[in-house]
């Protein structure tokens, strides 16, 4: 597993910052705050979830299930899109509380747009992963554990971002309540240099496997294909359409 911070655009060295624009302007405001108690969190919509990211020969494939639950006991929504585009060639999954994940995605999108406006070029995946880790560690986003996937000049990247802000890059990764079930299939099916089409089938099968036994996952699959040309996201309630 590889940590993205080394030599990233967000490494704080004197040489890097000397000729760069002031990183604190323009300001986007302070982080949102919350005053929820532990009891309140039982009534928060959560995604439960199985989310998967796979690097491929063509780019990256991300897959998620579609279920949201209330307190882990009641299915509150059967059509949740748990992967969102946050970069011209990058996407992030939603894991944890729905509100926290949506706020997290909105904050990252704002920073991505500001970076491009200041520098005239898209932010690299390593820098975006470092920024996402900083947000997860310092912001009030509850227990989120998203996957970031994207393509840049260095190639294809998949990162898992833990609730404490830890960032790890790997060829494939899984997060969420169904991760053990999905990992079992991925360990058998993953091969280097899979095409996007092949990885899509593998990822959908892994989501289906998790949905069979994990009560927090189910109701279909959203598939996200990322290449150097952009991001394509599509949902399927019937697993047979994609496996």
From Swiss-Prot:
Disordered, as annotated region: 1-29
Keywords for this protein: Autocatalytic cleavage, Cytoplasm, Hydrolase, Protease, Proteasome, Threonine protease, Zymogen
GO aspect biological process, one term: proteasomal protein catabolic process
Catalytic residues in the record: 49 (nucleophile)
Regulation of catalytic or functional activity: The formation of the proteasomal ATPase PAN-20S proteasome complex, via the docking of the C-termini of PAN into the intersubunit pockets in the alpha-rings, triggers opening of the gate for substrate entry. Interconversion between the open-gate and close-gate conformations leads to a dynamic regulation of the 20S proteasome proteolysis activity.
Enzyme Commission number: 3.4.25.1
Domain of life of the source: Archaea
Known catalytic reactions: Cleavage of peptide bonds with very broad specificity
Gene Ontology cellular component terms for the protein in this record: cytoplasm; proteasome core complex, beta-subunit complex
The UniProt record lists the keyword Hydrolase: yes
Polar residues: bias regions: 1-16
Keyword Protease (UniProt): yes
Localization annotation: Cytoplasm
Enzyme class: hydrolase
PROSITE patterns for this protein: PROTEASOME_BETA_2 (PS51476)
Record-level Gene Ontology MF annotations: threonine-type endopeptidase activity
Residues that make up the propeptide removed upon maturation: 1-48
Function comment: Component of the proteasome core, a large protease complex with broad specificity involved in protein degradation.
Classification via NCBIfam families: arc_protsome_B
Family: Belongs to the peptidase T1B family.
Subunit structure, interactors included: The 20S proteasome core is composed of 14 alpha and 14 beta subunits that assemble into four stacked heptameric rings, resulting in a barrel-shaped structure. The two inner rings, each composed of seven catalytic beta subunits, are sandwiched by two outer rings, each composed of seven alpha subunits. The catalytic chamber with the active sites is on the inside of the barrel. Has a gated structure, the ends of the cylinder being occluded by the N-termini of the alpha-subunits. Is capped at one or both ends by the proteasome regulatory ATPase, PAN.
Protein name: Proteasome subunit beta
Gene that encodes it: psmB
């Amino acid at each position: 597993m590889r940590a993205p911070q080394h030599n990233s655009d967000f490494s704080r060295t004197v040489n890097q910052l000397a000729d760069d624009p002031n990183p604190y302007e323009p300001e986007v405001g302070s982080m949102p705050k919350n005053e929820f108690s532990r009891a309140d969190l039982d009534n928060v919509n959560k995604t439960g979830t199985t989310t998967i990211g796979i690097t491929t020969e063509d780019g990256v494939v991300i897959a998620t299930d579609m279920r949201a639950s209330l307190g882990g006991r009641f299915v509150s929504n059967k059509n949740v899109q748990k992967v969102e585009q946050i970069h011209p060639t990058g996407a992030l999954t939603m894991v944890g509380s729905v509100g926290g994940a949506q706020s997290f995605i909105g904050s990252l999108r704002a920073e991505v747009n500001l970076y491009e406006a200041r520098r005239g070029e898209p932010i690299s995946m390593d820098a975006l992963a470092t920024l996402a880790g900083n947000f997860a560690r310092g912001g009030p986003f509850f227990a989120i554990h998203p996957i970031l996937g994207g393509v840049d000049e260095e190639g294809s990247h998949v990162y898992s971002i833990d609730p404490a802000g830890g960032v790890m890059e790997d060829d494939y990764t899984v997060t969420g309540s169904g991760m053990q079930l999905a990992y079992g299939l991925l360990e058998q099916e993953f091969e280097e240099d899979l095409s996007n089409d092949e990885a899509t089938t593998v990822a959908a099968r892994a989501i289906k496997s998790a949905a069979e036994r994990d009560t927090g996952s189910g109701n279909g699959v959203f598939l996200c294909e990322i290449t150097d040309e952009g991001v394509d996201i599509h949902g399927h309630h019937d697993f047979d359409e994609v496996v």
